Amino acid sequence: MKIHLFLFLTLINVVTYAQELPDSLSLEEAIAHGLAHNRSIINANREIQKAKKEKWKTIATGLPQISSEVNYQNFLEMPVSLVPAEFFGGNKGEFSELIFGTEQNMIGSLKMEQLIFDGSFLVGLQATKVYLNISENLFEKTNLEVKKLITNLYSNVLLASYNIRFLEKNKASLEDNFQEIHQLFRNGFEEEESVEQIQLSLAQINSGLKYAQNLLKIQQDMLKFVIGYPMETPLKLTDEIDDIFNENLYFEPLTDPNNIENNIDIRIAINNVKSESLKLKLEKSKALPKVNAFLNQTYTGNSNEFTFTDSDQKWYGSSLLGLNVKIPIFSSLGRSASTQKAKISLNQAKTQLEETQSKIRIDANAALNEYQLAIDNYYTEKENLRLAERIEQKNKTKFFEGMIQSFELRMVQLQLYSAQSNFVNAIQKVITNKIELETLLNQSKTD
């Protein structure tokens, strides 16, 4: 019965998960799904949770600490003490054997400690905030990288499908040409070479189409992997390449690339400077005194038998209130060396921040230049494709009118195929360069 109930509940969970799993995703939905299920993001979020626990751990060291201890002893053989026999009327120089205490004893104690002052504790509280900020920065950086990756992969899947449509269109056109040319050849109106040229083009198109179809499957699997989608489950992408790559919207001017204060790497570097500054404070605080207060309460029970659980067992109590003050006096220049080392680390962090700012500024301007170049190249390749299609159509007419040879037609067709490939690559380049620039400036519209 229990087994049947377990299987029933398991089946319900599986069905519920299947119902919640979408079978189609737009780009925004894919990004949202990836931000919720990507493994890198999940682990980055766990780092934030760890930082929060570390913060509370540090706070807890400044709060009262209470501990208890129970110590039970049973002497299998009682210790013997020697005392001068003359104390008991014996001869001088002789010793009497005495046994003190009972065979069994139990001591229970309760201790409370409270930190009064510790410079390192105060610095530690500040450090936990910085540590949490760094974890949040790394989480945001992971989010940005995953968004960029999902956008690129989603676009790659659509572009792969777009390229397949080109190849299928080319294949259909070649097959029609082959049938027509082959019929002309059989009737003696065309040379065998013309048939062979078409066969050669068809073979190349078929090979390219097979490769493109395999590449599409790989891109789909990569997208599923990144967004945390089951690999064995079919996934339909609802957006078309025209939905993502809209010229009027996609080529909107971005803000000044020199506006880099939102860059996540710079913010991480700034927090690193804060972290190293706190480490310097920590080393300096080690020269300050540490003050702790404590309160001990102890109860002792003695007996020759194990009677400690009896209600009439007698317990002897003692209490102690104290203050512990630890004052560093001389460390043989050890603290000084640690402080100087922390200063060097702080200067390194400041230099690294300056380097990061300069590098990001250069990268942002370079990315903007690449993006603008990609836009110009897109328009060039778009026009080249239009011209290549017209040229191919004209030469196809010329070929069937006997004005050009099959070799010339094949060269024109190869030119068209190259223009199609270049156009697809140009779209991909614009998308890739824009998302790279948006990531650098932290301006993604998918936020």
State each model region's role.
Residues 60, 207-229, 386-443:
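Short segments within alpha-helical structural elements
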Residues 42-46, 59, 100, 116-143, ...:
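Sec/SRP-type N-terminal targeting helices
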Residues 1-28, 35-38, 445-447:
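Bacterial Sec-dependent N-terminal signal peptides
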Residues 25, 29, 53, 139, ...:
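Periplasmic alpha-helical coiled-coil/stalk elements that build and connect Gram-negative outer-membrane
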